[in-house]
Each structure stands twice: as structure tokens, then as C-alpha cells.
């Protein structure tokens, strides 16, 4: 089976935090049946980091650290296969997701709706 806990930004700050658990990680029920047939990794392989901006990034990192049961190291929380980084809000948008880092076939940077996206080459 699968269970999930979703915490609203008013509870934890920054963004909705979804903490999900499944008996079989490879059979991700949230994605529906046959989701693996639709994976295309020729351009992007995975998300390696998300950046969340805050008025007080250290305080937000500590809150998230406590909820996730993971250590906050210099405003960064390392997960099993990715990282959450907390940075100062400087663009006037307030708290929220401010950047994504994706492992991709080619490197580059662009912006979508104020969110910076960094493509990090997989070296292939």
C-alpha cells in the first residue's frame, strides 16, 4: 500500500511538503498504472535539488529538518537521491520554490515563472 502526509506552507513554510511511503518504491501508485512506460530520460534523468527561498532560510531549514528527520547542514537537507536547499528570499515573491536542479543530457540554465532551472550535465 501507500500512505502520504501533506503539510501546507502555512504549517511548515516555503512549499507544500509531501512525505510519502510505499511498500514497493518501484510500483509508485500515485502515478497510476503503467507509468514506467511513459518515462523518457533522453533529456532529463532526475531532479537532484530543489531550492526554497525564505525570509529566514535557517529557521525554515530547521523546521523541515525536524519534520523530515534529516540533518540540516548549512541550510541544506540531503535526501536519499536529492537535496533541499534553503536560500534568502531576494526577488520580492516571498517564500516558495525558487530553483530546481536537474541532471540532464546537456547543461544550461533558464527561468520559468520566476523559478530558476539549472540543467547539470550527466557527463554522457
What would you call each of these model-derived segments?
Residues 1-49, 75-124:
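Vicinal oxygen chelate
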Residues 56-71:
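Amphipathic alpha-helical segments
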Amino acid at each position: 500500500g501507500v500512505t502520504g502526509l501533506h503539510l501546507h506552507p502555512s504549517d511548515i513554510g516555503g512549499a507544500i511538503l509531501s512525505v510519502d511511503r510505499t511498500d514497493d518504491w518501484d510500483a509508485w501508485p500515485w502515478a497510476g498504472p503503467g507509468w514506467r512506460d511513459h518515462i523518457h530520460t533522453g533529456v532529463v534523468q532526475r531532479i537532484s535539488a530543489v531550492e526554497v527561498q525564505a525570509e529566514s532560510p535557517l529557521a525554515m531549514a530547521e523546521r523541515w529538518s525536524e519534520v523530515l528527520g534529516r540533518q540540516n547542514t548549512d541550510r541544506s537537507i540531503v535526501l536519499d537521491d536529492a537535496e533541499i536547499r534553503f536560500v534568502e528570499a531576494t526577488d520580492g515573491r516571498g517564500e516558495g520554490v525558487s530553483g530546481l536542479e536537474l541532471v540532464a543530457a546537456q547543461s544550461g540554465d533558464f527561468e520559468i515563472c520566476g523559478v530558476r532551472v539549472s540543467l547539470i550535465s550527466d557527463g554522457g
